[in-house]
């Protein structure tokens, strides 16, 4: 369901059936964490997305139960509803993607039901971009996130692409493209990536891969 290569060379596999599998690519050894600590809070361990902090702790999107923080040393789970900062955020059934935005020093969570959550860990502050705060956003279901080389945040939604610029202004991609053949229909955007030349590749639900010249 999700893949992450952590800084220590481990591959983390979030599995739809439950739990996390780790692969040691240096020693070709597999480790499996069934996330029993998670099952104390909810009757599933189906991992939709995963992000590792510098200290090794994990943030995970859990199918049907939103977001959790996993302390790797203590093997303890903190659901977002019990988190001292994130407990004030809205409801979400899961988190589809998690990235760190360098420009603003924030963790960004692509939620299924509430747009994008932003969490500055050092400042202890969180805020949201959704259809209430930004009516120009046409869909609250966010599948993917990308911070480009200019510091803009790209939002891949169920209804196309939106861009949060460095001034925190939100635009739809179709407002910004200069060529009509680069405009996107209202379709799901599953993944985005930037190449070394600054082009953005966009994986769509049924329109193949689009390449956008920024």
Tell me the role of every PLM-derived stretch:
Residues 1-214:
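Carboxylate-rich, polar loop motifs that coordinate divalent cations or form catalytic acidic clusters
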């Amino acid at each position: 369901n999700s893949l992450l290569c952590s800084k220590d060379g481990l591959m983390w596999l979030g599995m739809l059936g439950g739990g996390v599998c780790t692969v040691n690519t240096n020693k070709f050894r597999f480790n499996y964490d069934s996330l029993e600590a998670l099952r104390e809070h909810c009757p599933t361990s189906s991992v939709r997305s995963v992000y590792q902090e510098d200290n090794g702790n994990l943030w995970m999107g859990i199918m049907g139960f939103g977001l959790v923080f996993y302390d790797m040393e203590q093997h303890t789970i903190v659901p977002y509803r019990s988190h001292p900062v994130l407990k004030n955020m809205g409801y979400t059934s899961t988190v589809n993607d998690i990235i760190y935005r360098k420009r603003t020093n924030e963790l960004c969570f692509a939620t299924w039901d509430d747009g994008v959550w932003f969490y500055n860990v050092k400042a202890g502050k969180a805020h949201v971009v959704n259809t209430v705060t930004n009516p120009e956003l046409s869909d609250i279901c966010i599948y993917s996130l990308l911070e480009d080389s200019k510091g803009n945040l790209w939002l891949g939604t169920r209804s196309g692409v939106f861009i949060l610029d460095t001034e925190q202004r939100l635009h739809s991609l179709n407002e910004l493209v200069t060529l009509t053949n680069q405009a996107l229909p209202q379709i799901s955007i599953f993944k985005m990536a930037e190449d070394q030349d600054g082009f953005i590749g966009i994986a769509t639900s049924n329109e193949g891969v689009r390449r956008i010249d920024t």
